[in-house]
A protein has these predicted regions:
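Anionic-ligand binding region
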Residues: 117, 128-156, 160-165, 178
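Active-site environment of divalent metal-dependent phosphoester hydrolases
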Residues: 12-17, 41-44, 65-70, 120-122, ...
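Acidic, His/Gly-rich catalytic cores of divalent-metal-dependent hydrolytic chemistry
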Residues: 155-212
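Active-site-proximal segments of metal-dependent phosphoesterases and phosphodiesterases across multiple
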Residues: 3, 77-79, 112-137, 171
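Hydrophobic "anchor" residues on beta-strands that sit immediately upstream
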Residues: 6, 34, 59, 112, ...
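Active-site-proximal beta-strand elements of phosphoester/diester hydrolases
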Residues: 4-12, 111-118, 162-166
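Short acidic-hydrophobic surface loop/beta-edge motif
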Residues: 105-110, 154-158
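Core catalytic region of metal-dependent phosphoesterases/phosphodiesterases
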Residues: 6-9, 13-97
């Protein structure tokens, strides 16, 4: 029996994008949903996206933006990111903050390893250039991470595979559609997915709460 996993990442508080992704996921016989982190940051719907993940029993791997919320820290690289992080810190419910605290640092089972950033720094390493020797001594075949917001699937010469499902909430690969992927554990099949959504809904909400 196959086990189909839906892998999402970098939702960043973008409710309209997550809603269409969940709708698309439900068209498939998915056993579980795993979030590679950064539920938080950039867009305002922090409680709504966490509620959806909870409703779908999703596992969340902690991302750097999630850490900023939990530890009440700021992003050292982006003033604009901190503006929305501060908003999210002010509105997130205690229940949802506690859920965020249950996020795991990585998910590893059989020949699969999943993190938010990379395998040196799970939370804040950018895996932009994929080199075979980086993974050579790591005892897994399938490596999943987010953080870069760039969807890709690379088959390496050492029979290992690198997969970034892309970003649900803020793609940075030239395609504005929300990104995620499906993974068939039994046969090792990776299916990269894109789903269109109404970006104007996000822009309107941002204006309503005073961002632009």
């Amino acid at each position: 029996m196959f086990i189909l996993i839906a892998i999402v990442s970098d939702i960043h508080g973008n409710l309209p994008a997550l809603e269409v992704v969940i709708e698309d996921i439900k068209k498939h016989d998915v056993e579980k949903i795993i979030s590679l982190g950064d539920v938080s940051g950039y867009y305002p719907f922090i409680n709504e996206v966490i509620d959806i993940l909870k409703e779908n029993n999703a596992i969340n791997i902690i991302g750097n933006h999630d850490r900023y919320i939990i530890d009440n820290n700021e992003c050292p690289r982006s003033h604009s990111a901190n503006i929305c992080l501060n908003y999210q810190k002010s509105v997130i419910t205690n229940e949802n903050k506690e859920w965020l605290k249950t996020s795991i640092s990585k998910y590893e089972i059989d020949n699969i390893s999943m993190v938010h950033g990379g395998w040196v720094d799970n939370e804040d390493e950018y895996m932009m250039k994929i080199k075979d020797d980086y993974f050579e001594k790591l005892p897994f075949k399938y490596f999943f991470c987010g953080h870069t917001h760039v969807q890709k699937h690379i088959k390496m010469i050492n029979n290992k595979e690198f997969i970034n499902p892309g970003s649900v909430g803020q793609p940075r690969d030239g395609n504005k559609e929300a990104a995620y992927c499906l993974f068939d554990e039994k046969i090792g099949e990776v299916i990269l997915k894109r789903v269109d959504y109404d970006i104007d809904k996000v822009a309107l909400k941002m204006k309503e709460i005073g961002f632009g």
